[in-house]
Amino acid sequence: MAGMGGRAWLAGLALVGALALLTSGCTGGDAAPNRSTVSVASSAPSTSTAPTSARPTPTVRPYPADVPLTGHNLKPGEKPPLYPAAAKARTQAGANAFAEFFMRTLDWAYATTNPSYMKHYAGPSCGLCAGLATGISKTAAEKHWYLGGRLTIHPATATPIGPVTAPADNCSLVMFDVTAFSTVDRTGKVFSGDGAHTGDRIKLCVKKFDTGWNVTYMAGTK
C-alpha cells in the first residue's frame, strides 16, 4: 500500500509490527478469594422443607469459550462479534460475510490483546494469520497492551482466487480503516505507534469445511 509507510512499522513491537504486516503485505490477576463469613443461627434448624424452585436454564455462549470479554482497548459495553448467519451459506456471498466477520475477530484481538477468537478461523496455510496472532500474544506476554488500532470493516466484495495457490473455494476483498494506534507498556508509557489509515484493502481466501469457513490466505493488496 504505497504512501502508507507500512514497512517502517516492522521495526516496532506487537501491534505496530502486526498492523504493518497487515497493511503493507497488505491484567488482571486471579479474583481475590471470598473470605467473607456466614453467620449461623443458634436456634435449632426447622424441620419444614422449603419448596424447591426449577433450576435456571444456563445461558448459551454465542462464541467459543476462550473468547475474551475484557480488555484495555474495549469500548464500554462492547461485545465480541457474532458469527453471521449469512456466513453459513456455501456461496460467494457467504464467503464475503465470513471475511468481514474474520476481520472483526482480528479487531477484537487488538481490543483485548488476545488472538484466541481469530485463531478459531485461521487455517494452517495462512502465514499472515499466524504472524498476527504471534505478535499479539507476544504483546500480552510482555504485559503490554494496545491503545487504538481499531478497525472499521467495509462490505467485502468478490475477487478472483488466482494467483493464490493456497487451497480456497472463494476469495474476498475487504476494505478497512484503522484508527491511530500505539503500544502501551505495563507502566502506562506509550512507546510506539502510528497514525490512522483509511481505505486499506486485504485479500482473504477461504475454504469451506463441515464446521464452517477457514481462512487459508490473507495478504494486503493495492
Predicted segment positions?
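Sec-dependent bacterial lipoprotein signal peptides
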Residues: M1-S24
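Exposed beta-sheet edge and beta->alpha loop/turn motif
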Residues: G5-A8, T27-A44, T49, I161-K222
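Secretory-pathway extracellular proteins and peptide precursors enriched for disulfide-bonded cysteines
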Residues: V16-A18, H120-Y121, P160-P163
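Juxtamembrane and targeting peptides
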Residues: L22, C26-G94
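Mature extracytoplasmic/luminal segments of secretory-pathway proteins
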Residues: T23, G123-C126, A168, I202
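Core segments of small alpha/beta cavity-forming domains
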Residues: N73-L147
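A short, amphipathic edge element
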Residues: E142-P160
